[in-house]
Amino acid sequence: MFFEIALIGTTASGKTYIANTLAREFNAVVLSLDSLCVYKEINIASAKPSQDDLASIKYFGVNLLSVNEHFNVELFIREYQKAKEFALARNLPLIIVGGTGFYLKTMIDGLSEKTLESKSSLNNDEIYALLLNIDPNYKIEKNDTYRLKKWLGIYEQTREIPSEFLKRTQKTGVLKDIEIYELAWDKEILKKRIKTRTKEMLDNGLLDEAKILFSKFDHKLKALNSIGLKECKEYLDGEISFKELENLITIHTTQLAKRQRTFNKKFQSKALEFDKALATLRMKFSIEK
């Protein structure tokens, strides 16, 4: 029977393991809610599902394009629509799983009217200073070039305060009444999991993946400035030691987890302890089935 749930949580919380286990047991379709897994060439840095998982589970949102191609929330919504159509046609459950909460929030709240990205020569610091002066309620990371340019584009084209423009032109969301489950971890235990995962990624060839990526593509591409790859670039350029590389990835990933935890408070979600999550969700799937 078709139904859909979202499974969210911080990086290294075990979301993918839970989703894959449920998908195998209940023949569910999975939509990856991850802004890095969409790229074909980024496998280790994105903690992408294994080749075995991708071969045995019907996945959407993975390996869609190359790192030099642009991906955004509009394209993600189209991928969600494909996943839903596939699951509906076969009467299968759909699991939306990942850590890019912004995509899930947009699917629930809806997109705003499309505007062009600014072609201004202003740098991130200059745009961010303008944003703080004009539109302090608009929340963007200072290094998020794409969203800063989008913000400036709205302001240039409309002369409205962008946060107010977006609220006024917002369309209806594509997700309605979806149950959202969030995997909860003790902060100190999560830090240890992040440290362990960082070591595993390096042992599994993260540096080799980074070498190939930086030899083929412009290192300024947004995808190549993600956590794990940007630190590898510093190491490959001789700016930091291997020990510093491992420590920096761990620190930056821990900081990301904190931001994800804060963002996820925007959702009306049900908290699940990892050890109890499978049993709870198995019961949910069995009832729906």
Curated annotation (Swiss-Prot):
Name the coenzymes or cofactors required. Mg(2+)
> Which InterPro entries does the protein's record reference?
Dimethylallyltransferase (IPR039657), IPT (IPR018022), P-loop_NTPase (IPR027417)
Q: Which reaction does it catalyse?
A: adenosine(37) in tRNA + dimethylallyl diphosphate = N(6)-dimethylallyladenosine(37) in tRNA + diphosphate
Q: Which UniProt keywords apply?
A: ATP-binding, Magnesium, Nucleotide-binding, Transferase, tRNA processing
Q: What does this protein do?
A: Catalyzes the transfer of a dimethylallyl group onto the adenine at position 37 in tRNAs that read codons beginning with uridine, leading to the formation of N6-(dimethylallyl)adenosine (i(6)A).
- So which domain of life are we looking at? Bacteria
Q: Which GO terms describe its molecular function?
A: ATP binding; tRNA dimethylallyltransferase activity
What are the GO BP annotations of this UniProt entry? tRNA modification
| Record-listed ATP binding positions | 9-16
Which residues are recorded as binding substrate?
Answer: 11-16
Q: What name goes with this protein?
A: tRNA dimethylallyltransferase
Q: Where is this site: Interaction with substrate tRNA?
A: 100
- In its keyword annotation, does this UniProt entry include Magnesium? yes
